Amino acid sequence: MTIEEKGKISPRKKIKGLEERYKEARQHIAVAILKESPPAEDVDISEAYQQSRSLLGDYVTLDWQHRQDILRIINQIKRYADDDTRRRPLNIIMQAEPGSGKSHMVNCLARKLEPHHAAAVNFNMASLQSIDDLSQPLDAVRNLKVVDRLPLLFLDEFDSNPANFATLLPLMWDGELQISHRDLMLGKLVIILAGSGKNIEQVMKSAKAMQTPPEAQETKLVDLLSRINGGELEIPALDTVAGDRDRRIDKVCLTIALLQSRFAGKLETIPWALLRFVVMSKFRYGVRSIAHLVDLVSPLQENAKAMQLSDLNLPLLSVPVLRDSSLAYHVFSEDGPAAIIELWTECCKSEIAVRIRKQGEEEEYF
């Protein structure tokens, strides 16, 4: 064995090392934000946050299992893109709650796959009134193929109307769809179907167990799922806590990403109270609701790098103020609105600052 061969690090060791860095990043944020009592002094989680951006940029996660699931899908798409003999669509199914950032994830996925000429086209199937409504996204797909791009066609809420299942079957099988007098031939593309219905999971389980569908009307769904040839991807709920898994850590990273996106990546420190409130609160629509909270933060002075607790001005001073605000549609508590106000008041007792970006560090935010 040569010296060079001895010095090589095996892929397994590299993965193990990366997994350890993810674990350390999670622990760092957990100690800083998730502990019951606030830290005694200002904390720096900038490196842990940067680790959450390492796979998909603005789609942040420190959840190792979720990262591995995403990576598996990325590799599936790469292999498909590089294989000129595969001309049928690559079909992927995504399971996620409403408001979980599905379209944002697909857009970040397309940016990650730019070396493979990927580009995203998004369409919400809940808005589909007739098959003619599919003309716009499919024409966008055709336009991308003209310039040699690999379209990622994202069809959100595909399960909102089971009557649409039959419409999707020819599209998923050979990339072809008849719309009025037009025969749209799409050929090679990636189709990502996203749904949130529990019947999807039930039908997938029964199909994998080679059992009959739970209900006779699920036959078309089984037929559709039989065309899934690119794998499955689940976006776990943000309040999932099970064993070593704590998705609340991703709520911290997500809040930072949303703040940096809004303020052009200039922020270096933010209040601990805001991150603690997000971690401990229940949001009705997941990512969408946290984004709404971030949008309610008052504008900062131009080129401001530090966000103070007094800068926030959130509608959380009292129950009447909360009830009269748009935030009332997004945050909830089993103990009622008074518990939300009490949580915010408790969080605001600490004026600890959290460093989220090193001084002078430059970064691209989308």
Language model region names:
Residues 1-84, 196, 293-336:
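Extended, charged/polar low-complexity intrinsically disordered regions
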Residues 1-19, 228-309:
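Conserved AAA+ ATPase small/helical "lid" subdomain
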Residues 1-16, 101, 225, 275, ...:
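N-terminal accessory segments that target, anchor, or regulate ATP-driven/P-loop NTPase machines
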Residues 85-105:
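Walker A/P-loop nucleotide-binding motif
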Residues 98-100, 127-130, 159-161, 191, ...:
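Conserved nucleotide-binding/hydrolysis micro-motifs of P-loop NTPases
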Residues 111-120, 176:
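Post-Walker A helix-loop "phosphate-sensing" segment adjacent to the P-loop in P-loop NTPases
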Residues 117-148:
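Short glycine-rich substrate-engagement loop in P-loop NTPases that contacts/grips substrate
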Residues 147-174, 183-192, 197-207, 221-227:
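Conserved AAA+/SF3 P-loop NTPase catalytic/coupling segment centered on the Walker-B
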